Amino acid sequence: MSDKPDMAEIEKFDKSKLKKTETQEKNPLPSKETIEQEKQAGES
């Protein structure tokens, strides 16, 4: 196996076979309020 991708393989790749997927955020960032509450809980 070489590190470089096989250009012939890339050229014959059919993009239409790819399915469109809806991106779902799995790890939404906590809100500022949540962060502040956790900070205060950790300090007490």
From Swiss-Prot:
Function recorded in the entry: Plays an important role in the organization of the cytoskeleton. Binds to and sequesters actin monomers (G actin) and therefore inhibits actin polymerization.
Family (UniProt): Belongs to the thymosin beta family.
Predominant place of localization: cytoplasm
Top-level taxonomy: Eukaryota, Metazoa, Chordata, Craniata, Vertebrata
Biased composition annotated in UniProt, kind: Basic and acidic residues: 1-25, 33-44
Protein name: Thymosin beta-4
GO molecular function annotation: actin monomer binding; enzyme binding; protein sequestering activity; RNA binding
Keyword annotations from UniProtKB, A to Z: Acetylation, Actin-binding, Cytoplasm, Cytoskeleton, Isopeptide bond, Phosphoprotein, Ubl conjugation
Induction comment from the UniProt entry of this chain: By alpha interferons. Decreased levels in THP-1 cells after treatment with recombinant interferon-lambda.
Residues bearing the modification Phosphothreonine: T23, T34
Organism from which the protein derives: Homo sapiens
